Swiss-Prot record:
Keyword ATP-binding attached: yes
Source organism of this protein record: Polaromonas sp. (strain JS666 / ATCC BAA-500)
A Gene Ontology BP annotation from the UniProt entry: modified amino acid biosynthetic process
Name of the protein described by the UniProt record: Putative glutamate--cysteine ligase 2
Family according to the record: Belongs to the glutamate--cysteine ligase type 2 family. YbdK subfamily.
């Protein structure tokens, strides 16, 4: 299959996808209710879409094309409200977070869809272990070459995205010591990691054609890169975020991406180089392991500094662009959390420290996700 034409999209437009957990309200373990949820949700007129994911205890929601983070919040809130009301009817709950803290991967069921069955046959147990939950942010690019430039500029900020969204400290009932353990599961797949260093669509097409000739890939969907071009949408898709515990934080992360993209497209602040990737995996590991306490190695200078400081410095640098795209509130929310050394991984650990019961932590996380939606479950 040849590479798709890169479609036009409005520069800096946004789209957000969230993979969410479905849990029972007895012991708050994952529950295979995706099909029932989809049946209920498809009766409700909503923006965006609600679709199944790899295993039947997951569901993915997505916005339509949005021009601002406030529009993202409006759409996510509307879908969230419908989700939790549908879940109430089934006596289950919907939860954010990058991993379920104590689910056992071997108990998962692959959702009955041809692509998921094909992936399960190819990847074996990895498919069930892929019951992890991420946020993807699409940002519109005016043309294909701009998309690749933006992708490689954005790669310097992968640690920032990981630390700000980290919400997966627990796996199989254990504290992993990672703020984002979810991304360790992604690395197991052979076509994960980072995109090849190509700054023009012609060069990228050469790479893609070579890969398809090997028979290893058939389409862009086969690449699990941290950031990948999405030619059919005219976007790049950033895929390293853990799903946050609230739609408000998910929106703030999208606003941060949009502000960075505005800075890149309007000021061309630096030219990415292949050498940017010398420290890429190290920076990525630091952010996964230590979150906001990570060390950041500047790809341009080789200098070391606390990631927290680099995040705050970046936010100050892009504040004007955030204001211009209407993402000032998003930046403020994230800035405040960084100053308090506060991310969702910390919240989960603090709750577990108080409760000493991961099921209760999930119950509280479910309450947090639903926001102000009144509970409609029957007694």
């Amino acid at each position: 299959m040849s590479l798709e034409v890169f479609h036009k999209s409005a520069a800096l437009s946004l789209g957000v996808e969230l993979e969410l957990q479905l849990v029972n309200t007895h012991d708050y373990d994952l529950a295979p209710y995706a099909e029932d949820m989809l049946r209920l949700m498809h009766k409700i007129p909503l923006p965006g879409s609600v679709v199944p994911e790899m295993t039947s205890s997951m569901i993915e929601i997505s916005t339509g094309v949005c021009s601002s983070s406030s529009e993202v919040l409006g759409q996510l809130s509307q879908i969230r409200d419908a989700l939790v009301k549908s879940a109430d009817k089934l006596n289950i709950a919907v939860v954010g977070g990058g991993t379920h803290p104590f689910q056992q991967w071997h108990e998962r069921r692959i959702y009955d869809k041809p692509r998921f069955r094909e992936l399960s046959e190819l990847y074996g147990y990895l498919s069930k272990q892929f019951t992890i939950f991420g946020q993807h942010v699409h940002v519109g690019c005016p043309n294909a070459d701009s998309a690749l430039l933006t992708l490689h500029r954005m790669s310097r900020y992968i640690p920032h995205f990981i630390a700000l969204s980290a919400s997966s400290p627990y796996v199989q009932g254990q504290d992993t010591a990672f703020d984002s353990a979810r991304l360790n599961s992604v690395f197991a797949f052979p076509l994960s990691g980072r995109a090849p260093f190509a700054l023009t669509w012609d060069d990228f097409k050469v790479y893609f054609d070579k890969m398809t000739r090997t028979g290893v890939v058939k389409s862009m969907k086969d690449f699990y890169w941290d950031i990948r071009p999405k030619p059919e949408f005219g976007t790049i898709e950033i895929r390293v975020f853990d799903t946050p515990l609230t739609v408000e934080r998910a929106t703030a992360l999208a606003g941060f991406v949009q502000s960075l993209a505005s800075w890149f497209m309007n000021e061309q602040p630096f030219m990415p180089t292949e050498d940017d990737y010398l420290v890429y995996t190290y920076n990525r590991f630091q952010a996964c392991r230590f979150g906001l306490d990570a060390v950041y190695v500047d790809p341009a200078t080789g200098g070391h500094m606390p990631l927290r400081e680099h995040i705050l410095m970046t936010m100050e640098r892009i504040a004007r662009h955030a204001g211009a795209v209407g993402a000032g509130a998003s930046l403020h929310l994230l800035q405040t959390s960084v100053e308090r050394s506060d991310n969702d991984a910390r919240w989960l650990r603090e709750k577990q420290g108080e409760e000493r019961l991961l099921a209760e932590v999930i119950r509280q996380a479910a309450q947090r996700f639903r926001g102000g939606v009144t509970h409609t479950q029957l007694p």
